[in-house]
């Protein structure tokens, strides 16, 4: 059964035709009422994926199909009409930049409804109040304030209210909690979960923070240098990662992994750096401690279980190498990778 959103073979590049793609052959599916997380380091292509999915960035190749209609090829009037429909909504990453500083909260939330052009003033006002109430904001108290006169957590919720005012079927939220304190972060995450359970809304959450997704996402896609290296049910991916890069991300998130260790960005290169470029071979080859000759060919995402894929030539051998290193003479990987893979193997054997 096809999903509400189907992304296939999506490639995006900026500048020259021979420029390295920002997204390279991305595959992603989102079903009705599902929360899907997209995780990865800064620069992995997460925001470009979100912006391409909603029609803000044209792809070089591939397809984006929403509710059975291909939208990646829409241009001009057809694209503007689709955006105005509000069925696919995007909550931008930075509220301060996304919200017009001269528009009050009420006017900011009303703007996409006014642009749609099919509602009267009375219904627009009612929809604005409904959206603000849904995100836990008092329209009577905050509606006439400017963005600069409310807190960061309130601005983030105004951005979400604006995104859901059109009653979309799918919301793409780009780093919705990255700049919030713990209290506001949890409030926004509960809101996203409630939109799914109460409205049947599908949600894509773009994040570099794994702990933000651990409690609410159904599935997760791991993006590295524009390619999806692993994808599957969130508990399975976080509990037993099948790609070395995923294991490093999890090891760097104490609240998810239960441990510590340096972040993925601190991973040193492999002992023998590959002679090929990331474009030719595995995108993770220049950092992977398990790189071998076959990694010269870029691995395609392959099924590794129900609903799971991993783009690695050495699944599951790299995990076996980690388990056998007791202690390693020549380390098969950095300590945090050994810890992450070793602990999850022990858990799997219980």
Language model features with spans:
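Conserved ABC transporter NBD signature motif
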Residues: 62-73
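Conserved ABC ATPase signature
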Residues: 146-150, 154
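Conserved catalytic motifs of ABC-family nucleotide-binding domains
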Residues: 167
């Amino acid at each position: 059964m096809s999903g509400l959103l189907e992304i296939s073979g999506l490639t995006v590049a900026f500048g020259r035709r021979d420029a390295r793609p920002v997204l390279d052959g991305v595959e992603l599916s989102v079903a009705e009422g599902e929360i899907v997380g997209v995780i990865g380091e800064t620069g992995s292509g997460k925001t470009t994926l979100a912006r391409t999915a909603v029609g803000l960035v044209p792809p070089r190749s591939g397809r984006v199909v929403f509710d059975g209609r291909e939208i990646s090829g829409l241009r001009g009037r057809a694209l503007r009409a689709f955006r105005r429909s509000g069925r696919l909504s995007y909550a931008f990453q930075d509220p301060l930049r996304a919200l017009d500083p001269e528009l009050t909260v009420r006017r900011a939330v009303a703007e996409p409804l006014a642009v749609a052009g099919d509602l009267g003033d009375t219904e627009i006002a009612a929809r604005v109040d409904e959206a603000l109430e849904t995100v836990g904001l008092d329209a009577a108290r905050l509606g006439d304030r400017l963005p600069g006169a409310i807190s960061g957590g309130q601005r983030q919720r105004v951005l979400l209210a604006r995104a859901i005012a059109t009653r979309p079927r799918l919301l793409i939220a780009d780093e919705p909690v990255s700049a919030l304190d713990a209290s506001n972060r949890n409030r926004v995450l509960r809101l996203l979960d409630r939109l799914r359970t109460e409205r049947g809304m599908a949600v894509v959450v773009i994040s570099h923070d794994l702990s933000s997704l651990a409690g609410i996402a159904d599935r997760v896609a791991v993006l590295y240098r524009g390619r999806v290296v692993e994808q599957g049910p969130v508990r399975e991916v976080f509990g037993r990662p099948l790609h070395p890069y995923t294991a490093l991300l999890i090891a760097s998130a104490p609240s998810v992994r239960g441990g510590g260790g340096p972040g993925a960005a601190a991973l040193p290169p492999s002992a023998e750096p590959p002679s090929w470029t990331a474009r030719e071979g595995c995108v993770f080859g220049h950092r992977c401690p398990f790189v071998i000759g076959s990694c010269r060919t870029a691995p395609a995402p392959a099924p590794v279980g129900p609903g799971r894929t991993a783009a690695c030539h050495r699944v599951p051998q790299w995990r076996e190498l980690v388990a056998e290193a007791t202690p390693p003479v020549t380390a098969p990987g950095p300590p945090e990778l050994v810890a992450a893979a070793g602990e999850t193997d022990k858990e799997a054997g219980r």
